[in-house]
Design a protein with these regions (language model features):
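Active-site metal-binding motif and surrounding structural segment of the metallo-beta-lactamase
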Residues: 63-114, 139-144
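Binuclear metal-ion centers of metallo-dependent hydrolases, dominated by the metallo-beta-lactamase
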Residues: 143-147, 237-331
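Conserved beta-strand hairpin/beta-sheet module of binuclear metal-dependent hydrolase folds
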Residues: 25-72, 172-174, 220-231, 249
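A gly/proline- and charged-residue-enriched helix-loop-helix capping module
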Residues: 118-130, 138-144
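Active-site neighborhood of phospho(di)ester-bond hydrolases with catalytic His/Asp-centered motifs
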Residues: 59-62, 79-87, 116, 228-234, ...
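Intrinsically disordered, low-complexity regions enriched in glycine and serine
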Residues: 1-7
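Active-site-proximal loop/helix segment associated with metal-binding centers of metalloenzymes
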Residues: 40-41, 156-243, 249-251
């Protein structure tokens, strides 16, 4: 099942580098970096690559993204879109290298880059940070307003909502459209076949030869589209829950342990417990905790999962660099 209050008995899982969590999948997150503002010996700056069928979406490329992609077996040609939450360095300093690698490797398809429009000056500085032979495939998509629909993918809806951080910040929600599966055997038994089935799907109803109205809903099932959410630097806010609503996979910052809730509030970040509460309120299926402060050593990492699990009873992954996390299979 999904999230909910603590007390349920569901598996808790914790990630380690170079591993794969949740089995093989055509929809899979590769975690490139998991540190907070300061990288450590064990954790590099942010970077998250989501493979979603034919799409390859790179979120928040921090320093070292190019190199981590090499370790993960990813190339510039795999990137079809970039989504930047905000222009703090740990979420964007890898952008110049990624853009220049796209140009150098001759990527031929459009690579759309969504980012907060209020940070346009930083986008331009990063986009043209050094001398290189440029490319015209990189397409800027500045975001504005209280809700932004990010265009470009025909089979995927990407929504961006503002979060509460010290600079303009957006979180992202990817939604696969629901699909209608027609029950052909039942229609055949009713004498409805061929072009009539197409009309029924297109219009939602038809009138049969006897003058009886036939509703599509009575002869079909709906396959719910899957949802992925990416919520980076923010304090607790309603938009974090809206972005994560019914998500199959939520990637969320958990910079601090609950004992540092005061620091989290001061710098507009989340604690592990707060991340768990957001996941529970949103009904998430699998939760990935990341963006871990450099103040915590390896001996304290288990506490992140414990504190999130006090509120959320779904699967929990404490992300490590180069771990792969599958989007859970359809229910």
């Amino acid at each position: 099942g999904g999230g909910g209050g603590g007390g349920g008995v569901c598996p808790k899982i914790s990630g380690r580098g170079f591993g794969r969590i949740g089995g093989m999948s055509a929809r899979e997150l590769t975690v490139l970096g998991t540190a907070g503002a300061v990288p450590t010996k064990r954790r590099g700056h942010n970077g998250y690559f989501l493979r979603w069928d034919a799409h390859g979406i790179l979120f928040d490329p921090g320093e070292g993204t190019q190199r981590q992609m090499r370790y993960a077996g990813l190339s510039a040609h795999d990137i079809t879109r970039v989504c930047i939450t905000h222009f703090h360095g740990d979420h964007s300093l890898g952008l110049p290298g990624v853009v220049q690698r796209i140009a150098r490797d001759g990527v031929g398809h459009p690579v759309r880059v969504a980012y907060p429009g209020q940070g346009q000056v930083y986008w331009e500085r990063l986009r043209y940070a050094t001398c290189f032979v440029d490319t015209d495939v990189v397409v800027a998509q500045p975001l504005a307003g209280e809700q932004a629909v990010v265009g470009g993918e025909e089979d995927l809806r990407i929504l961006a909502l503002p979060l509460e951080h010290s600079v303009p910040t957006y979180g992202y929600r990817l939604v696969e459209p629901d699909r209608v599966h027609v029950l052909a055997d039942r229609l055949e038994a009713r004498g409805i076949r061929g072009p009539a089935v197409g009309r029924l799907k297109a219009e939602g109803f038809l009138v049969d030869r006897d003058g009886v109205r036939v509703e599509l809903a009575d002869y079909s099932t709906v396959r719910r589209g899957q949802v992925f959410a990416f919520v980076m630097d923010t304090g607790v806010c309603d938009n974090a829950v809206r972005l994560a609503a019914d998500a199959d996979l939520l990637v969320i910052e958990a910079t601090f342990l609950d004992s540092e809730a005061g620091l989290a509030a001061r710098y507009r970040h989340l604690t592990a417990g707060q991340a768990g509460m957001i996941a529970a309120r949103a009904g998430v299926r699998r939760l990935v905790l990341t963006h871990i402060s450099e103040r915590y050593g390896s001996g304290e990492e288990g506490r992140f999962v414990e504190q999130a699990a006090a509120h959320f009873d779904g699967d929990i992954v404490l992300a490590h660099d180069l771990v792969r996390v599958a989007v859970p299979p359809r229910r």
